């Protein structure tokens, strides 16, 4: 069960695995407010995803580890699972959509995982992973709809709240909802006055549509340059957490994201991935 104690436990477990990324104050991007970036692109594996995947794997039983782990991913969760599994001597198989960037495919292999490329998008890779789990008996590590994974992502909020005493709001990119669920749950329990806002692409508005319709919606198709959040259906757990703790979700267009990518480079020399440039 998700709890604040679980998030703090994740922070303890992850201390020897991840980097604590310091917030970076920006100048010029948003002159009317104090804007800080949390550069998880500097995290090991290049993404926050390793927080959730590494904590989840740390919580597996000896029997679950012995079966080997299987995961599906648009690319970043894949690398986190591969790294954490290899560090623990666990066999890993990752299902990736064939649209995943070759750099992420090769990095996943480099961290020690076997890769299965699946025609289509993330959701097709998910279906293949479930099929192989049932057939081969692997332990499945979900990329976002898992309480241990969500707790791992929630450690980001612990770091942000520790770094910034007077923070008003946290803005988070949304795909399946694991990141924003962890951040919102943690932030609201520690500092309830902090607003948490999500941002999702107009070409993949699964969580946005679900929240506004009051029930989980599955998209027929997703089409966005932000491949890391191109998810047709949010998670059951993440939907409930977002509904309860997130203040609002906004949609942004492909053009807005393309323009926003340039701002962090210009003002902080940090390159934002399309998935995060939607903020």
Positions of PLM-derived features:
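PLP-dependent amino-acid enzyme catalytic core
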Residues: 1-273, 277
